[in-house]
Amino acid sequence: MQKPQFKRRVLWYSFFLIFLLTACVAPAAQPTTETAATTDAAPTASTTVTDTVAAGDLPKVGLMKLVSHPALDAEQKGVKDALAAAGFIDGETVVLQEANAEGDIPTLTTIAQKFVDDGVALIVTTSTPALQAAFNATKDLEGPPIVFNAVTSPYAAGIAKAADDHPAWVIGIQALAPVEDALALIPQLMPGIQTVGYIYNPAEANSVVNTEIAEPAAEALGLKLEVTQISNSSEVQAAAEALAARGVQAFFVSTDSTVVASLEALIKVANENDLPLFANDPASAQRGAAVALGLDYYQDGLDTGALAVGILKGELDIANTSIERQRKGSLAINLAAAAEQGLAIPDDIKAQAALVIEQ
């Protein structure tokens, strides 16, 4: 009676041993396309859109900026238009992840780290603080690639040593505003002027650079800059009122994002005290500055967008590409604002303007 039972046991153990042997020698399972597509490992600087699409997913591009105001918004619009013109359509061939720190510099660190954790193929930064945050989040991995715009000086910001000496995963276009030329318009339009009010945020490396340019340039023109520092946009109006009380005869604002984000507060004080407002961003004239001479930020966005396209297509060698300087700019005049602020604009200056706002 035991022999049949023994035979059955032997047969069962034989099948079991065969199963074990088969399992041991079977090749390791390979990830499927679907599994590979959901892997969010941060790409290196050599990642291309072709690599990402081949993995079965749309490439992700992170766009980050310090705050929303016309110049920075124009930069990002230029980038997105350049991407779209090259076939990188949001939701169709690429996923654009946009993030705005709403003027809070520490928030940029969180945004940059999230982009890295999300495995974006590329980060586009708008403003100097955004570039610094993205650089700090990517420096250990040396990627993903970064394209920067609206940066006064990547050198003073501690990102690059020279135009051809920069991190192998970081590239962009320097947007150094024509501070000296904009200041020169003040005594030209206001002969005899002596003091000009100037507000900036020292936490913005770009503003420190502009201030270091503005102070000696103003002195060379026979002007004294009355300088006030702020730390956030809510302080702009009080700072402007304090400068007006100190007897300044005009205001000048460069490309400080903290100030420009709350430009209307400065314009209010300028209008109430008949103090002409001169600016370093043409878009500021549309908001109420009397005279604005500066760079074309939409064009700068298009140009940096072209760099982003080159990276996504795997055609741009970042390490061997030099940082260029944006030189395309224009003069804008707001005649209604000038009249409100007590400034007369002669015809020869109007003739030089790319944009004249009548009312």
Language model features: what each stretch is:
Residues 2-7, 25-359:
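Short hydrophobic alpha-helices and adjacent helix-cap/hinge residues
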Residues 9-17:
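Sec-dependent signal peptide recognition
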Residues 20-23:
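C-terminal motif of bacterial Sec signal peptides marking the signal peptidase cleavage site
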